[in-house]
Amino acid sequence: MDRLADRKEIINKMKMQVKRLNPRAKLPTYGTALSAGADLYVCLEEPVTIQPWQTAFLPTGLAIAVPEGYAGLVFARSGMACKRGLAPANKVGVIDADYRGQVQVALYNHGPEAQTVCHGDRVAQLLVVPALSPDMEEVEELDETSRGSGGFGSTGSN
C-alpha cells in the first residue's frame, strides 16, 4: 500500500462531528489529498469589509466536536495572508475538545487597504492535532541542559 492510501485509511477511521448552525454554511474541505489543514469558509448574510489594522469576527456557521485527546488549531491560509494581508488576529486559534459553540475566525487586516470578505470565502485552515494535558508539578529546580535559559535568538542568527 502506498503512503497516500495508508494516510487515507488512518484518516477514514477518524471522524469529527460537524453541525451546521446555518443552512448556508459550507463544511470544511481539504484542498488536496495530502493537505494537512481543512479550509474554513465564512458564512455571511452580507459582505464584511475589514479596515486596515482592524479585526472582524467572522462566523463559519458551524459547530464542531473535536475528538477527545485532540485540539483544533485555526491557522492563516497562506494565500489570504500573503496576497491580501488577512490572517487570524490571535495568530493561532485553539478549539478545545469540549467546546461546542460556533467556530468563528477573528480575522485581522495587516495591510494598508480595506479588504472585503464575502460569503463562502476560505479565510483560515483547521488542523486537528493530538493534544496532551500533562499534570503540572511544581519543583524547586529544573534539570540542566546545554542551552540553559538562552532564548530569543540564543542558538544563532540564521
What do the predicted segments below correspond to?
Residues M1-N158:
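DUTPase catalytic domain/fold
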